[in-house]
Amino acid sequence: MTMQVGRGEHFREGSWLERRIARLRGARTRPAPAALRRLHELMLDLLPGDHLVSTLPGGERVRVAARHRHLSWNPEEYAAFKSAVRPGATVLDVGANVGAYTVLFAQWAGAAGRVIAFEPSPETIAGLREHVRINAVADRVEIVDAAVSSGEGTASFDCAGASGANALVAADGGIADGVITVRTTSLDRFCESRGLRPSVIKIDVEGAELDVLRGARQTLAQPGLDIFVEFHPSIWAARGITRDEIASELERQGLHPQPLHPSLDVWNTEGISVRLLKN
């Protein structure tokens, strides 16, 4: 479960509409239907002021667009990522969503650093661009509107807005409402074409971990690279993959997963990354 470690702070006193929304949300015991969630987002757009500020344990201040006030940071991930991303680092944020960590990576890497954020969902990219803009890190963040997979081409992608559940659709998953065609690339192909040697890679791709790993064998073999990946075992079966396949791919690459907290089982934990270490 992701725990919020940031402290939300408004630039202005909440309006009557915001307070009313908060009371209504607090009274609900079931997840809101999509239409109601969308109405809530539109109402937030009408509020005075366009963002909030979260202050994290290290003193970082992250401006958050009002409609994305749900953003949170896991304390173990926050600490591990901060330790890995040093000034001047080149960071690949694979599955950046609306940029909760993209913005932090950019702050930590500094003006001499570089963050490349991959995100294929048009709606989510809009939130990502907004957070890059209002946090004044556009000079060091490049947004790539593509899904990272095992190779170049196109794929079906299930858009779930900015909920964090956006995902590539399995080959036999069929086509449904909300599914679009997106461009795909692999980390190996992308890095080779740009002459990139990343310092840190964060992967959070909602069940597509195996394809990303397969398409990154050369990149992940580079020395001195910090690698983090979030596993999604609850949806592997729906994507037609197994734990054994992922374990086999990691073994082939000479990697093994290590939890960010000693109490966690790397194969049965979601909502937090694991670190991939060289054998």
Language-model segments: residues:
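A short, conserved beta-to-alpha structural element at the edge of catalytic cores
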Residues: 120-123, 224-238
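Short internal loop-to-helix segment that lines adenine-nucleotide cofactor pockets
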Residues: 70-92, 140-142, 154-156, 169-223, ...
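Conserved beta-strand termini and adjacent loop/short-helix elements that scaffold enzyme active sites
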Residues: 144-146, 185, 230, 260-262
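Core alpha/beta nucleotide-donor-binding catalytic domains of modification enzymes
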Residues: 122-125, 129-165
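Short, glycine/acidic-enriched loop or turn micro-motifs at the edges of active sites
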Residues: 96-98, 122, 148-150, 205-207, ...
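Alpha-helical elements of the RecA-like P-loop NTPase motor core of helicases
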Residues: 103, 125-126, 166, 210-214
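S-adenosyl-L-methionine
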Residues: 2-131, 136-140, 174, 191-194, ...
